[in-house]
Amino acid sequence: MRTYRYFLLLFWVGQPYPTFSNPLSKRTSGFPAKRKALELSANSRNELSRSKRSWMWNQFFLLEEYTGSDYQYVGKLHSDQDRGDGSLKYILSGDGAGDLFIINENTGDIQATKRLDREEKPVYILRAQAVNRRTGRPVEPESEFIIKIHDINDNEPIFTKDVYTATVPEMADVGTFVVQVTATDADDPTYGNSAKVVYSILQGQPYFSVESETGIIKTALLNMDRENREQYQVVIQAKDMGGQMGGLSGTTTVNITLTDVNDNPPRFPQSTYQFKTPESSPPGTPIGRIKASDADVGENAEIEYSITDGEGHEMFDVITDQETQEGIITVKKLLDFEKKKVYTLKVEASNPHVEPRFLYLGPFKDSATVRIVVDDVDEPPVFSKLAYILQIREDARINTTIGSVAAQDPDAARNPVKYSVDRHTDMDRIFNIDSGNGSIFTSKLLDRETLLWHNITVIATEINNPKQSSRVPLYIKVLDVNDNAPEFAEFYETFVCEKAKADQLIQTLRAVDKDDPYSGHQFSFSLAPEAASSSNFTIQDNKDNTAGILTRKNGYNRHEMSTYLLPVVISDNDYPVQSSTGTVTVRVCACDHHGNMQSCHAEALIHPTGLSTGALVAILLCIVILLVTVVLFAALRRQRKKEPLIISKEDIRDNIVSYNDEGGGEEDTQAFDIGTLRNPEAMEDSKSRRDIVPEALFLPRRTPTARDNTDVRDFINQRLKENDTDPTAPPYDSLATYAYEGTGSVADSLSSLESVTTDGDQDYDYLSDWGPRFKKLADMYGGMDSDKDS
């Protein structure tokens, strides 16, 4: 027979609280329908009576915040298989098992080891099982039970905000909603009154009130004025336990600000204002400021100013400064001291935003009187017009009067005025003006085709006060006269085919005219009288300012006459009639059967501008030949500068070179007259010149004496003489040194020559022996003795 096992669940309730138990619904699995009955009892152990049961008692209750020194007893587990011999062991698992909750494995007693807080965790779910201590096998199925934590009033109400901020319009009705405050209590709202909160006001009466259940704050006093008091601080208390004695409470502060409404009209601090302004003030000039005060703020304090009455509302205006809320009096039109000296205005200040419910307080506007005094100033002359427009024919003579301008001093003194033309606007001085009466006249001839409009400026200046002057623009239009003859619109050059037929159109002519007649241009075309009878062409006037050139005969011969020049007379229809003669060039050309030109003397008519292929080839060949010539010339010159390959051992030559001499370069050091080296007389003279006193004494440099070769010497001297006397010989064929004046030169230094006026006994005849290079010097100085004798 199968053994049924049961748990005995016992709940012990500590004093002074009673024992609670809740039935569990019937189990549907794991156990037969018939069960042994369990009976729960308090601290005393009552007899267990067996009875058929259908509910299990598996729920325990435990109070939170236990403050005793011992563990808090929860309940007891017991199995029918427990004979009390210690063979069974009770095991507890689940939420807090072994930590918060412990079980006596021998007796099944459950205890709580710590203080429990329902607000942290209200329910704990655990599982219990009885097992054989020796085998470890369960003797009862695992059973689940619940431990619920019962609430106590251990949490005070807490507001959602520490400080509330709210606003309400001033002058609000009683009961106007301000703000709602909310407090929450962490205690269990389903158990007792621990979480039932009631609101009350501790500070803020009699201005505000609060609803006890909802926490809604409302106004409680009528006509609260922001201008008297703007800020209010209200303290609200929230208390649990329904507000009963012993309940916990919390407070919060509500800062309430009265917002402004337009309940105050603007007011001027004074009833009359007075300002001064000179009559020369231009429109828009500020004269003065007025300000009305308004006790309101924001847009309710905005003020609009306007001129409602007075004799100067057309001359002055008032605008509102949005930053300072001041009214700025400005000039609207030009003032004239001579016409009116004092103006009186009525200025009104009003609120643009008015609430109808406060209209009973009176009109939301105020007015003040403004008196404006106009001061006299010395004003510049005033022209009778803002601008003048005059006309004149382009054929007008010099000093022709065009018109006049007029200006006068607006002041009471009526100072005289003189006129002048601003020459910056009339640089060519085409016009002039009479300084006394303002008459405008021409000073040069006009040409409409050059300039149609002349824009000048006339200046009017007070004679007694030249600083006072004014200007006016003067526009002068030059009227057209028919002074230009019509002419061809372009240069006409055309051709006619040799096989052309009579009356064939070969060119259409057009004309232009610089004049601008009112009725439009109407030109007529005709051949000049001298060509009309003998011409091979005729002119056909199309009556639309165009004409056509027609052939007059059949066939033309370009070999007999290649070009025809047709003089065409163009006339206009204006008065006086103007005409001009233009020439049309007609060339006779050979054409194909379609009339297209093939060849004629005027090649430019058919060939495009540019070069043919043959011309380009010829140019390229010329360039190549030129380059070859230059290269050969350079190579030949370099070859001549090279030293000879074989130098005779008998030919010993030395050069004295000064490297810091800024002479002519390579030519100065290499080109010398070799003939002087082969002239013993010249060499002897260079050794003993008695006619010249040297500035410094230099020892002559001795060179080895070369073997005298008469044939070579005569041959070289002959060739040198031929080249020296040949004026067409190129310069690089003669080797000579003219600028070098160093020691050792066979010609000595020219710096030792003295003036003829200081030493008349000098003999310069030896210059003739130095060759043709010194012939000029020999002519100048060699014959001086004979000149003196004569």
From Swiss-Prot:
Residues 1-18 form the signal peptide. It comes from the Eukaryota. Residues 19-53 form a propeptide. Residues 54-615 are extracellular. Residues 260-291 are annotated as: Disordered. Glycans are attached at N255, N399, N437, N455, N536. Residues 637-790 are cytoplasmic. GO terms for molecular function: calcium ion binding. InterPro entries: Cadherin (IPR039808), Cadherin-like_dom (IPR002126), Cadherin-like_sf (IPR015919), Cadherin_CS (IPR020894), Cadherin_Y-type_LIR (IPR000233), Catenin-bd_sf (IPR027397). It is found in: Cell membrane. The chain crosses the membrane at residues 616-636. The modification Phosphoserine is found at S786, S790. It holds the Pfam family Cadherin. GO terms for biological process: homophilic cell adhesion via plasma membrane adhesion molecules; Notch signaling pathway; synaptic membrane adhesion. Residues 269-279 have a biased composition (Polar residues). GO terms for cellular component: glutamatergic synapse; nucleoplasm; plasma membrane; synapse. PROSITE patterns: CADHERIN_1, CADHERIN_2. SUPFAM superfamilies: Cadherin-like. Three calcium ions are usually bound at the interface of each cadherin domain and rigidify the connections, imparting a strong curvature to the full-length ectodomain. Cadherins are calcium-dependent cell adhesion proteins. They preferentially interact with themselves in a homophilic manner in connecting cells; cadherins may thus contribute to the sorting of heterogeneous cell types. This is Cadherin-6. It comes from Mus musculus (Mouse). The lineage of its organism: Eukaryota, Metazoa, Chordata, Craniata, Vertebrata.
